[in-house]
């Protein structure tokens, strides 16, 4: 049985005519001193059921987050991590620095055909050349995010 997060991604793939859903989210926008960090993640369809218990990380216990992290990094899940430094945040502003971190995180996925990036938040990531769809509260709606 699939989770609501899996169903959301499946419906987005159908609606957007995508073969590949990549989730992108950031962390670190709250601290006064950077960096802001973003992650882009692609879970192959054959592995989606292995992560049926994934939910918004803010709703998980520390122990569950650690367990999921270990499962993700040891599985065939493709991911990229991007950073924007405190200096880049000061120079660009936090929103533009977040988009920079997202672009850096998604770099390895740029050549995937028929891919769509689901971006957590109300705005598309400026400068990201992947087709993208912003999803408000995406980390609570999408498995990929």
Where do the language-model regions lie?
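Acidic (Asp/Glu) carboxylate-rich active-site/surface patches
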Residues: 1-37, 41-145
């Amino acid at each position: 049985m699939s989770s609501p997060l899996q169903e959301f991604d499946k419906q987005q793939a159908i609606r957007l005519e995508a073969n590949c859903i990549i989730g992108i989210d950031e962390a670190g926008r709250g601290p006064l001193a950077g960096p802001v960090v973003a992650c882009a993640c692609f879970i192959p369809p054959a592995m989606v059921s292995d992560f049926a218990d994934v939910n918004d990380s803010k709703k998980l216990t520390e122990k569950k987050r650690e367990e999921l992290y270990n499962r993700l990094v040891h599985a065939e899940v493709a991911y990229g991590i991007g950073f924007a430094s405190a200096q880049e945040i000061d120079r660009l502003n936090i929103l533009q620095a977040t988009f920079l971190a997202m672009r850096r995180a998604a770099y390895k996925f740029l050549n995937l055909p028929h891919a769509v990036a689901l971006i957590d938040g109300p705005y598309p990531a400026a400068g990201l050349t992947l087709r993208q769809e912003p999803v408000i509260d995406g980390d609570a709606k999408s498995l990929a995010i």
